[in-house]
Amino acid sequence: MRYRRVQYGLVAAILPRQRRKIMYQDDYRRIDEMMRKKGVFTNLETGKQYYTGYEYATLYDWDQYFEAIVQLYLGWQSDYARLGVEIFLDTQKENGHIQRSSDGSEYQLLEHVKPFLSQICLLIYNRDGQVDFLSDKDFYYFNRLKRYLDYWLLRPENYYGLAFWDSSLHTGMDNQRDRAGHWSACYCCGVDLNCYLVRECRALALLARILKHDKDAEIYDAHAERLAQTILEKMWSPEDGFFYDIDRRTGEQIKVRYIGAFATMWADVATKEMAKSMVENYLLNPREFNRGFIYPVLSASMPNYIEAPLPEDWGCSWRANTWIPTNYYVFEALRKYGYVDEATHLANETYRQVKRIGDREYYATETQTGCGLDPFWGWSLLAYFMPYENESGYDPTKILVEKNDKILLT
């Protein structure tokens, strides 16, 4: 059954524009104060300062991309974002591998950093107009960026060039074991991962052109196009009208529907018809993703769609739970493909729910309550900027060179 597009009312328009601006400024001042007080730490090995939303001071890979967007909106200098990238690149091994967090368990440190470092550098360039730190010392950090991305792209175990996660913990969606397995499982070619890689290759290609490394730009543009084509050929299910991960051991699709499939839209990989099926048959379907606190990270039709953790779970819960960074990139994806009303509803509803419940690490979808760290000053704070992006049309996640002078805290 196809679920029709709904004409959502503009929730934000209920309040007069000037009153909304005052309300948003109050939000921005409050979270800016909290972030400055709680989120800045110093790396003991390098002495470099960085930002993290975690009270135990760990710097995580994809978190810092979304956290950097918040910092820039609040008018912060790009230093913490830059130094966070450097901290990761400083740990690089000869083969290009970088641990995915600044500290953690033995297994965690064996897993490669998620592909967001070049995208963070592009955020920095669009704010500052330069990325000199990449070219300093004979392009020391730029060369490390290339090696880290090549580690993902050129592993001989990849399936038709599709990269794979080491475990469910590695995906960042900690307990989605149904699709990615336990520690060192190493079989899940994630739709999410390979779409992040498409974006990361395009971002590194842009940085290469900025640094006048045109040959490198051609190489990573070609990687992006090859990956995008393989995602379309191998991961799309014509029968279901949905993208699925691949088990690299068998070549079979892993029939778990999760929010990361919509990264195909965020990365401009899905065709218009594919996006139409995914949005209208799944995202808007109450039996799939259109639940209480939109949108859960796992479809409600999946067997393990529950809020409580299961035995053998590690980390946080990514099942019947709503996480703001995935809401955020689904919001950007909807706008890209012309789902304006749905994007508006998602932006306003995410803001409303976070404002009501509070700044939490994540949320229980069905009971609409907060979970995890309380308070949390990490990527969940993106919720406060989604109404602005919706009203202004601005998208800081676009992979292009575009001056970012959007400082919202006045």
Each predicted region: which residue ranges?
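N-terminal accessory interaction module
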Residues: 406-410
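Structural helix-adjacent loops and short alpha-helical linkers that scaffold large soluble proteins
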Residues: 23-26, 72-85, 124-146, 206-225, ...
